[in-house]
Every structure is written in C-alpha cells, then in structure tokens.
Amino acid sequence: MTFCFFTTQYLPTPGGVERYTWNLARRCLAAGHRALVVTSSLPGLPARETDADGIEIWRLPAWPVMNGRFPVLKPHPPAADLWAQGIDFAVIQTRMYTQSVWAARQCKRQGIPALVLDHSTGYMMHGGAAGLAGKMYEHLACNIIKACGFPFYGVSGDVCSWLRTFGITAAGRLPNAVDPAELAQLASDHPRDFRAEFDLAPATPIIAFVGRLIPEKGAAKLAEAVRQLNQNGTSCALFIAGTGPEENALRQLGAPIYALGALPHPQIVQLLTQASCYCLPTEYAEGFPTTLLEAAACRCPIVTTHTAGTGELLPDGTYAAYLESTAPAALAAALQAVLADPDVAHTRADAAYTNLCAHFTWQAVFATMEKTAAQAAKRS
C-alpha cells in the first residue's frame, strides 16, 4: 500500500507531531509499504525529495504565519504529481491547519480513504479578539473536514474527549508512542556526559526539562524552583533542552540552570537517561507529550502536572509524582520530595516503563493503523 501523511509541520522542525509522523512513516517502509509525507515549504529545502529513510517528501508553498507556528497553505498548491502516486490511504495530522482542510477535501475528491488524527486538547489561541477569531476558525475548519466524512482519531483519551467540543465522536485512539529498544540504543551510542561536561560532581542530581520554551510549558517557573532548592541547601542542576521565546532569559540565569538550546534527539535521550528526574510543569493544551513517553522509556522518574495522556501512561501516584500547582514553591517542594527518596522515585519509573512497553510502542500503533487502512481500502 501507499500511505500518505499530511502534516503541516515536519522534520527538521522539532515537535511531537513531526516525530509521530516520521515514526509511523518508517514503520510503513519497514512493513513493505510506501510512505509519502506532504508538508509545508521551508527555506533551503527542496519542494520534493526522498530522505535517508526512504520517505518521499512533498513540501507545498505556505506562508509562515505566527513565526512559522501556523503555516498557511498558499492557494492552488502544485499537487498534480502527488495525486498521480496511487495513494491507497491518507493520514491527516491535526484538525486545525489550512493544509488539513485542503487535504481532507482533496482526498474526498480523489476517492482516497483517510482518517484525521488530532493531537491537542485545547484551542490554539486564548483571550481577546484574536482568541475569539481563532475559536471561530477552528470550528469552521472542523466543520469542513467533518463534511468530508472521514473518521477522527485522537492520540490520547483526553484528545478524544476534546473532539466532542466540535461535535465529533472519535472512532478510536492511535496513541503517541516510542520504541524502547531504539531509545536504549541511542542512549548508549557515543553518550554525552552532562555531569562531566558541566563540571558537576557525580552525585549532583540533574533535573531535566525538554520542550518548547513558552510560558505555558513552565520552564521559567521550574528554573525558579531549582534556584530556590539550591538556596535552601538542596544542591541540584536543571538542564533545559529546547528553544523558544524564553530561551535567552533562561540562558542568562547561569549555573545551576543550563539552557542547552535544541539538542539532537540522541542527546535528549542521553539527558533523560542520566537525569535524576524529568519535570514537565505544563499548562499547555497537550495531546500526549512525547517527552513523557521518552522519559518513561529511559526509566527516568517523572514529575508532571495532570495533562493529556498522563492518565493512560501514568495512571496514579505509583507511576509518577503529580503536581497540583505550578507555582515555583510547589515545584520546589515536589522536586525536593522526589530527590530525597530515590528508591521510591525509581520504583515509580519502573512501573511507568512496564506500562509503556505494554501499551505505547510504535509497533502496536502501526498495527492498528495498518488494519484500519486495509479495512478502509476494501470498503472503497
């Protein structure tokens, strides 16, 4: 079969949806299928190429609205060659982008069976006239896609619940996932020793944060919490991997706060493997954070807010330490408790790892998608 993934943003742009698409496309190829990815144009990258994995990529002209966070497809994109590829099944990533609307309408017109896979649990914009306009647009986009008749799926149960906001009953889940064996290999290949590189004592606890550096993700509050811990006699270091508007301010804080910028994926895995805990104090409308899955795969103790996917991966306090507040003082108290009892922290991490391996692997997710595609192809 020829699978086509429509994803408005794709690698090398970092992000969970981008890696989700890449991982499923690779599983398509491994199973003997063909994988196409249709995404937005990026400066310096060709309109069409086949990458090192064998994934065929189409980049359609788009305007980089909101500093590239919301690419808007330009009218009448050159796609005749795409539709000539004999696409058997399409996966349309996310419900909100203009490319998603275009892809759904084109797939219906071309008679290509498809599903829509959503990754969020909230509106893209909040507050004021812009927030109201954004909500109106999202409902309009969903209504257009719904009219095409394709089933909607969510990457977590929370996403499926959020889809009801748009009058959509999800057909099922295609959860975010990881490959534990692949991550273990990345952790051991030419590892970067973060403690040695930054002249930390071998026993110094490392707290890791991986994500976009925007206020909703909580990195700045976490940095303040770590500063408070050190002032109160708990020596520890915070390593922040990611980019965004808060990056420069975080860099200026200096030790024990280390803003590393964007890291290659192997180094993110190595950081999680070496960390004493991974902290995600997010208040963002997450879908199912990939970093939580990767931390669980690395057996890194997790400290997190209740966010999308946590109820499935980390059902209760025996799997992770949950935050009831993201205030720096509350973060500091939660981290202090985790660092003070590493045995309990690692017992939780082992439970999270076991649950991950049972339910959240790419092999399992692709098997579900492949079965769905085969059934849809027969009906068409």
Predicted regions and their residues:
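Nucleotide-sugar donor phosphate/pyrophosphate-binding loop at the beta->alpha transition
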Residues: 113, 122-148, 153-154, 161
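Short alpha-helical donor nucleotide-sugar binding micro-motif in glycosyltransferases
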Residues: 262-263, 271-275
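Conserved acidic donor-binding segment of nucleotide-sugar-dependent glycosyltransferases
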Residues: 316-328, 337-343
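Nucleotide-activated donor-binding/catalytic signature segment of Leloir-type glycosyltransferases, i.e.
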Residues: 248-266
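Acidic donor-binding loop of glycosyltransferase active sites
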Residues: 273-287, 300
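Carbohydrate-associated surface elements
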Residues: 158, 177
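Conserved donor-binding/catalytic core segment of Leloir-type glycosyltransferases
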Residues: 4, 153, 201-217, 223-226
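Short hydrophobic beta-strand element within catalytic cores of glycosyltransferases
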Residues: 292, 301-304
